[in-house]
Curated annotation (Swiss-Prot):
Keyword Cell wall biogenesis/degradation listed: no
BP GO annotations: caveolin-mediated endocytosis of virus by host cell; fusion of virus membrane with host endosome membrane; virion attachment to host cell
Lipidation (N-myristoyl glycine): 2
Organism name: Hepatitis B virus genotype H subtype adw4 (isolate Nicaragua/2928Nic/1997) (HBV-H)
Post-translational events: Isoform M is N-terminally acetylated by host at a ratio of 90%, and N-glycosylated by host at the pre-S2 region.
Disordered: annotated segments: 70-115
Similarity-based family: Belongs to the orthohepadnavirus major surface antigen family.
Protein name: Large envelope protein
HAMAP family per UniProt: HBV_HBSAG
Gene symbol of the encoding locus: S
Length: 400
């Protein structure tokens, strides 16, 4: 009995008329014929099992002559289970022999006259003729660009330009340029307002410090409030126009503004001197007169050409000149230092001290500034008896 059973099952892989209607032994996972035993229970990885590749495709008459299972039945809702004969598509060839597999080539694009007929209304000659107009040229070419073909002037350029603008419309405005053009003045206005508020607070702070010098140890108060005019108590820095101290407050503010203006001018002068825009002739050794301009014979020639005088010359009686080039930077500062050193000889003793201070690192300077700011008021009261000894110490240190 085992032989016919095994023979029938061995042929079920190719015989479409012998299906597995009851669903027993699906894919022969538990069939003892395919060595199902306790030593190899995992049939998912069994190499001897039969996957029945053709058993699921049930042909006509699989359930006997004239028998068609109703609405699906045991084999599901496939057309074969309903008894309908369908033609299965042929299996594709393997990938190694399939020369048509993979991405198909991109089809050829249709011609431009079919996809964009509006672009074919002008030929190349008319297009280059229309580019002669700077307004049209800006639409198609960047700044400084030019067309590769020769552009011939055409008398009907106005009509061509009008036709182009009637078809394409006016060019769109560049919003980036508009934004940058508006952002610049707004930033300048904001900076001016900020500086104006700070500048107005600086005189008030200096005025408060100035008036506090007259009220050491007592709260400041305006002396004009005790006059014949009844005025409420107020500070000397906020006198009303009816107060007698108002004119003194205005005078203090005016002096403070002049002081701030002087500081700004000094800063501008230092900046111009650093950039070499103040061509001041240095003092020549052994001479008190200098002159600028061409010389007959210069012992020292100035290098390069500039819009400023390049050398300073002394003109002796023999006609020859002694020339010294003007420094390219700090010319005015060097002139002031030479002038002061010639009249005050003790300033030369400060050169070594200045060179030593310049050699210090910025960290040391920041530390010194912080110490003076934090301990300065207390140190002044402690070191006040020793202040007369400071010039003596500086003189001894410079003479060593």
């Amino acid at each position: 009995m085992g032989a016919p059973l095994s023979t029938a099952r061995r042929g079920m892989g190719q015989n479409l008329s012998v299906p597995n209607p009851l669903g027993f032994f699906p894919d022969h996972q538990l069939d003892p014929l395919f060595r199902a035993n306790s030593s190899s229970p995992d049939w998912d990885f069994n190499t001897n099992k039969d996957n029945w590749p053709m058993a699921n495709k049930v042909g006509v008459g699989g359930f006997g002559p004239g028998f068609t299972p109703p609405h699906g039945g045991l084999l599901g809702w496939s057309p074969q289970a309903q008894g309908i004969l369908t033609t299965s598509p042929p299996d594709p060839p393997p990938a190694s022999t399939n020369r048509r597999s993979g991405r198909k080539p991109t089809p050829v694009s249709p011609p431009l006259r079919d996809t964009h007929p509006q672009a074919m209304q002008w030929n190349s000659t008319q297009f280059h003729q229309a580019l002669l107009d700077p307004r049209v040229r800006g639409l198609y070419l960047p700044a400084g660009g030019s067309s590769s073909e020769t552009q011939n002037p055409v008398p009907t350029i106005a009509s061509l330009t009008s036709s182009i603008f009637s078809k394409t419309g006016d060019p769109a405005m560049n919003m980036e340029n508009i934004t940058s053009g508006l952002l610049g003045p707004l930033l300048v206005l904001q900076a001016v307002c900020f500086l104006l508020t700070k500048i107005l607070t600086i005189p008030q702070s200096l005025d408060s410090w100035w008036t506090s010098l007259n009220f050491l140890g007592v709260p400041p108060g305006c002396p004009g409030q005790n006059s014949q005019s009844p005025i409420s108590n107020h500070l000397p820095t906020s006198c009303p126009p009816t107060c007698p101290g108002y004119r003194w407050m205005c005078l203090r503010r005016f002096i403070i503004f002049l002081f701030i203006l002087l500081l700004c001018l000094i800063f501008l002068l230092v900046l111009l001197d650093y950039q070499g825009m103040l061509p001041v002739c240095p003092l020549l050794p052994g001479s008190t007169t200098t002159s600028t301009g061409p010389c007959k014979t210069c012992t020292t020639l100035a290098q390069g050409t500039s819009m400023f005088p390049s050398c300073c010359c002394t003109k002796p009686s023999d006609g020859n000149c002694t020339c010294i080039p003007i420094p390219s930077s700090w010319a005015f500062g060097k002139y002031l230092w030479e002038w002061a050193s010639a009249r005050f000889s003790w300033l030369s003793l400060l050169v070594q001290f200045v060179q030593w201070c310049v050699g210090l690192s910025p960290t040391v300077w920041l530390l010194v500034i912080w110490m003076i700011w934090y301990w300065g008021p207390n140190l002044c009261s402690i070191l006040s008896p020793f202040i007369p000894l400071l010039p003596i110490f500086c003189y001894l240190w410079a003479s060593i």
